[in-house]
Curated annotation (Swiss-Prot):
This is Phosphoprotein. The N-terminus consists of a long intrinsically disordered tail. The central part contains the coiled-coil multimerization domain (MD or OD). Forms a four-stranded coiled coil structure. The C-terminus constitutes the alpha-helical X domain (XD) that binds to the nucleocapsid (N-RNA complex) and the L polymerase. Keywords: Phosphoprotein, Viral RNA replication. SUPFAM superfamilies: Phosphoprotein XD domain. It comes from Measles virus (strain Ichinose-B95a). Residues 144-160 have a biased composition (Acidic residues). GO terms for molecular function: RNA binding; RNA-directed RNA polymerase activity.
C-alpha cells in the first residue's frame, strides 16, 4: 500500500512539473472548454468525437486535462467520457439513462484501486460509482491505464473512519447501491446479499455478483519501513468493517474467591449457579462476507480464555491489599488527629498547674511572715541584761486558742484560778483585767478611728491637704482651697473649714 501511494504521489509531482515547464495557454483552455461545452450540449455525440476533441488540445497531457472543468457545470468532468458512454454503461448496469444524464452536470474524476494495485475504471463521481462485472476485478472502461496511473488525486488519504480507500478493494455492486451506500451497508444488508448468492438467486442483471476480498494480512501491513500516516504509524492494519451486532459472546468468566476477609457483612450465595471455565465465541458470519471480527476476539479464540485466571486473582488480591492499606491509613490519621487534640488539652492543663503552683508559693511566703505577739512577756528593751526568757508562743503560727496568755493580764494569779476552777468542776477563763491593760474611753474632742477632729497642729493641716488633693474637684478650686487653708489660724476656723470642705466634696 505504501508503494502504491508513493507511486501516485510521484505521478502527481510529474504532472505538476509538466504544467510548470509548459504552461497551458489561454487558447488551449478555451478550446478545451468549448469541447466540453459541445459534449454537454450534444448528448448523442459518440466517443470518437470526444477523442478527436481531446487530441485537438495542443500539448495537454492526459492527467492534466482531467482537471479542467466546464464553466457552465461548475465542476470538473471526466476526460474522454461523453453522455453516450454514460448511457451505454447505464444500460449495461440496469440504471435508467435519464437519471444518469441528470447527474452528469457536475461530475468529478475519482480513481479506485483494488488490492493488487490495478486501477478500476468506469467511475463517474463519488456518489454514483459503477463498476463492471468481472471475477478478477480488472475490468476496463474508458480512460486508459495512463490516466488512472498519472492521476493527481491522492488515493491514500483516509476517510472519516480512518481507513484508506485502497483497503476497501473493488466490488461490483448492484444497481441499488452507490459508493456511499457500500460504506454504510453493514450488518443485515450484506448478510441478505450473501444469503441470496448462496441460494443461487442471481441479481436482475447477469454478471452482477458481490465479491468482497479477504482482509489484508496484518504481518504484511507491519513490514513497511516508513510510516505514511501519523495516525496508524504504519504498524496497525485495517481489518475491514467490523460487524459487532452479529457477534454474541459466550458465558461470563467467573472470579475466584478473594483470600482476604471482607470488611462488611457478606451476602448468601447459595443460589449462584456453577461457574464455567471457558466458553466458545458464538458468531454469525461466513468467510465469504468479508466482515471480520475484532483482532481481540481472534486472539482470544486462538489463545484460549479471555482472561488469565491466575493473573486476575493476583490483581484482585493486590486491589484488596491496597484497600486494606488505605483503610489502615485512615484509622492512623484519625488517631493522630485525636492525639493532636489531646496535646492541646495537656498544654492547657500544664499552664493551669503552673499558675496554681505560683499561687501556693505566694501563700506560703505570706504565712511564713505571720508572727503573733503575746503581750506581757519578753525582754525589756530598756534592760537588755534581764534574765527573762522569750515567750515560747512568740513564733510563726496560724492561730491560737482563746485561753492562752490570759493569766498574764488578769488580776488573780494562775494557781488560785486553777484551784477555784477545780472546786467548781470547770475551768473558768473569766477574770478582771489589770488597769494598765484596760482600754480608756474614746474622747469626742480628740481624733481617733471613730472620726477626725482638726486642731491647730501640723498633722491636722496635713490631713486636710490630703483630703483636698484626693478629691475630684477642679484644679483651680483645689488651689483656691489650699490658699484658704494657709490663711486660717485658729482651731475653730479650721474646724469650720473642714466641715465646709466635706460638704463641697460630698455634693
Amino acid at each position: 500500500m505504501a508503494e502504491e501511494q508513493a507511486r501516485h504521489v510521484k505521478n502527481g509531482l510529474e504532472c505538476i512539473r509538466a504544467l510548470k515547464a509548459e504552461p497551458i495557454g489561454s487558447l488551449a483552455v478555451e478550446e478545451a472548454m468549448a469541447a466540453w461545452s459541445e459534449i454537454s450540449d450534444n448528448p448523442g455525440q459518440d466517443r470518437a468525437t470526444c477523442k478527436e476533441e481531446e487530441a485537438g488540445s495542443s500539448g495537454l497531457s492526459k492527467p492534466c486535462l482531467s482537471a479542467i472543468g466546464s464553466t457552465e457545470g461548475g465542476a470538473p468532468r471526466i476526460r474522454g467520457q461523453g453522455s453516450g458512454e454514460s448511457d451505454d454503461d447505464a444500460e449495461t448496469l440496469g440504471i435508467p439513462s435519464r437519471n444518469l444524464q441528470a447527474s452528469s452536470t457536475g461530475l468529478q474524476c475519482y480513481h479506485v484501486y483494488d488490492h493488487s494495485g490495478e486501477a478500476v475504471k468506469g467511475i463517474q463521481d463519488a456518489d454514483s460509482i459503477m463498476v463492471q462485472s468481472g471475477l478478477d476485478g480488472d475490468s476496463t472502461l474508458s480512460g486508459g491505464d495512463d490516466e488512472s496511473e498519472n492521476s493527481d488525486v491522492d488515493i491514500g488519504e483516509p476517510d472519516t473512519e480512518g481507513y484508506a480507500i485502497t483497503d476497501r478493494g473493488s466490488a461490483p455492486i448492484s444497481m441499488g447501491f452507490r459508493a456511499s451506500d457500500v460504506e454504510t451497508a453493514e450488518g443485515g444488508e450484506i448478510h441478505e446479499l450473501l444469503k441470496l448468492q448462496s441460494r443461487g438467486n442471481n441479481f436482475p442483471k447477469l454478471g452482477k455478483t458481490l465479491n468482497v476480498p479477504p482482509p489484508p494480512n496484518p504481518s504484511r501491513a507491519s513490514t513497511s519501513e516508513t510510516p505514511i500516516k501519523k495516525g496508524t504509524d504504519a504498524r496497525l492494519a485495517s481489518f475491514g468493517t467490523e460487524i459487532a451486532s452479529l457477534l454474541t459472546g459466550g458465558a461470563t468468566q467467573c472470579a475466584r474467591k478473594s483470600p482476604s476477609e471482607p470488611s462488611g457483612p457478606g451476602a448468601p450465595a447459595g443460589n449462584v449457579p456453577e461457574c464455567v471455565s471457558n466458553a466458545a465465541l458464538i458468531q454469525e458470519w461466513t468467510p465469504e462476507s468479508g466482515t471480520t471480527i475484532s483482532p481481540r476476539s481472534q486472539n482470544n479464540e486462538e489463545g484460549g480464555d479471555y482472561y488469565d485466571d491466575e493473573l486476575f486473582s493476583d490483581v484482585q488480591d493486590i486491589k484488596t491489599a491496597l484497600a486494606k492499606i488505605h483503610e489502615d491509613n485512615q484509622k492512623i490519621i484519625s488517631k493522630l488527629e485525636s492525639l493532636l487534640l489531646l496535646k492541646g488539652e495537656v498544654e492547657s492543663i500544664k499552664k493551669q498547674i503552673n499558675r496554681q503552683n505560683i499561687s501556693i508559693s505566694t501563700l506560703e511566703g505570706h504565712l511564713s511572715s505571720i508572727m503573733i505577739a503575746i503581750p506581757g512577756l519578753g525582754k525589756d528593751p530598756n534592760d537588755p541584761t534581764a534574765d527573762v526568757e522569750l515567750n515560747p508562743d512568740l513564733k510563726p503560727i496560724i492561730g491560737r486558742d482563746s485561753g492562752r496568755a490570759l493569766a498574764e493580764v488578769l488580776k488573780k494569779p494562775v494557781a488560785s484560778r486553777q484551784l477555784q476552777g477545780m472546786t467548781n468542776g470547770r475551768t473558768s477563763s473569766r477574770g478582771q483585767l489589770l488597769k494598765e491593760f484596760q482600754l480608756k474611753p474614746i474622747g469626742k474632742k480628740v481624733s481617733s478611728a471613730v472620726g477626725f477632729v482638726p486642731d491647730t497642729g501640723p498633722a491636722s493641716r496635713s490631713v486636710i491637704r490630703s483630703i483636698i488633693k484626693s478629691s475630684r474637684l477642679e484644679e483651680d478650686r483645689k488651689r483656691y482651697l489650699m490658699t484658704l487653708l494657709d490663711d486660717i489660724k485658729g482651731a475653730n476656723d479650721l474646724a469650720k473649714f473642714h466641715q465646709m470642705l466635706m460638704k463641697i466634696i460630698m455634693k
